[in-house]
Amino acid sequence: MSFSSSNFYVILSISLTVFILLFNINKVNSTELTSFTITKFSQDQKNLIFQGNAITTSTGKLQLTKAVKNSIGRALYSAPIHIWDSKTGDVANFETLFTFAITAPYSSNVADGLAFFIAPVDTQPQNIGRAGFLGVFNSETYNKSIQTVAVEIDTFHNTWDPKINRHIGINVNCIKSISTTSWVLENGREANVLVRFDAHTNVLSVVLSYPGLPDSYILSDVVPLKDIVPEWVRIGFSAATGAEFAEHDIRYWSFHSELSLVFNNNNANVSSSVQSA
């Protein structure tokens, strides 16, 4: 019996198709979701952990600090966030939108600023005696053990800061930012901040804008979260004052993350969760 080359390629094509189908059958996709929106902070806000001087007010604000000297306040979302998966190596995409206001009695002397941060689940306020660290970091030099990423909105110039005065910064494991851009504080006015992380490119991007004003302040950098923070983290805000001061408020906060997981079907342990405020 003869066996033509055309028959060989037909059989090879069929075999490859069957292999691809079987390979895909053995893969299971799952997505873990975390999503919440807080449009008004209640005085009995059960999904937040308060540290230091942070409180919620009768007017619906999350007040991190009052306009007093030497104050630190932090508020964390109570449920840990699965930011990357150790079994698959997959990392979550996320975005968070928040509205803040910084109000100082004297607009020329404002300190020190606030930060959105991602940190270990057991995170505690850092460097309480030095307000320039914003209650998030304990050093101006890189310290891998901190396992923290932050977006700082800095109102006071310290020795480790860039030459520009007030700035937005992306910080990794220390208070000295890896990227910065200047911004103009509108005393007492609400500003919106959008923070996004793209797991495919490892790009963390920040956009700050004041409603009704034309300028936007934009910043981005590569931040490989899987190499920096633990698999499970907490997210939240921190603010601090020193000899100079201001009231630091959060007026609105939403967060959404998606962790797409691909498992082997033979050993799949698939879960999907949605958390809401």
UniProtKB/Swiss-Prot annotation:
InterPro entries in alphabetical order: ConA-like_dom_sf, L-lectin, Lectin_LegA_CS, Lectin_legB_Mn/Ca_BS, Legume_lectin_dom, Leguminous_Lectin
Domain of life: Eukaryota
Biological process according to GO: response to symbiotic fungus
Molecular function terms from GO: D-mannose binding; metal ion binding
Coiled-coil regions listed: none
A Pfam family recorded for this sequence: Lectin_legB
Keywords assigned: Calcium, Glycoprotein, Lectin, Manganese, Mannose-binding, Metal-binding, Signal
SUPFAM superfamilies xref list: Concanavalin A-like lectins/glucanases
Signal peptide: 1-30
Binding site for Mn(2+): 152, 154, 161, 167
Function as written in the Swiss-Prot or TrEMBL entry: Lectin that may be involved in a cell recognition process.
Protein name, entry field: Lectin 1
Organism: Medicago truncatula (Barrel medic)
Gene: LEC1
